[in-house]
Amino acid sequence: MEKEKLVALLNKDLADEHAATLRYLVHGWLEGEDTPLGASLLSRAREEMWHMHWLGMIIGQLGGEPNLTPAGYPYDPTSRTTIFKSYVEYEEKLIPHYNAEADAVENPHIKRVLQREAWESAIHARKFQRIGGKLSAEQAAGLPGGERELPQDFLDRLQKEVASKNREMLQHVRNAWVFQKDALIAWQLMDQAMGKMKQLAHFAEDVAENGITPTFEPGGIEKITALETALVKAREDVSAARQRHLELREDQESQKHAGLVTNLDLTLQQEDYESAELGDLAKAKS
């Protein structure tokens, strides 16, 4: 298979895995991370992130540009029963899809990755089928989500932080894949991306606890071609985020919620660390 055609194929798969990651994350947050359903869904989402990572690494190795705009995820939102049925159907469709792609490629590593995507999708389908079958009558007929407590304008502010932190994270992930020949720096960027995922989750959980679906705005990922430029831009982004979070921590509404303030304190300390690390990495590359 020609390289350009292979990159296009893998990028489509990447978009599909991205869609699954977001769907299971959002559903897990709406259920609540401390509930059995929520914890199970977040576990599936983490596995989908690995699926994204395997594909993104290959795309980067091939010299391609990763597509970080998620595809759509079709599901029936009528009830938990219909939602989980949709999940089973989605994962089952991926099994023959990935197996067919594996048959079409010659590279042994890429073939194995696609085969693994297929059999892990089969496991996901079985797990979702099992969850759906164990729902109580009340759970089966109901929908996830809590009652709204926070003011709408404050929720809107948190939603913007979800979208902003998501862009920061995806930019780091993209850069780690594209610049993977600089192995140590690429790993440090991926390490920071994992931290940004935790920061994103803090905001998203607060939104979801109010019965609101966390939203992710696609796009905004820069196709930077020089690693030094990527590091400088990353430090600028984290500095801007830190300033917003300092202001958010002092907001009167934030001060009413000790858990939110604690998470912001952690995020601010992490952002100080990230900024210092990025500064040193940029100096080393200059």
Segments predicted by a language model, with ranges:
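Iron-associated oxidoreductase/ferritin-like identity signal
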Residues: 1-286
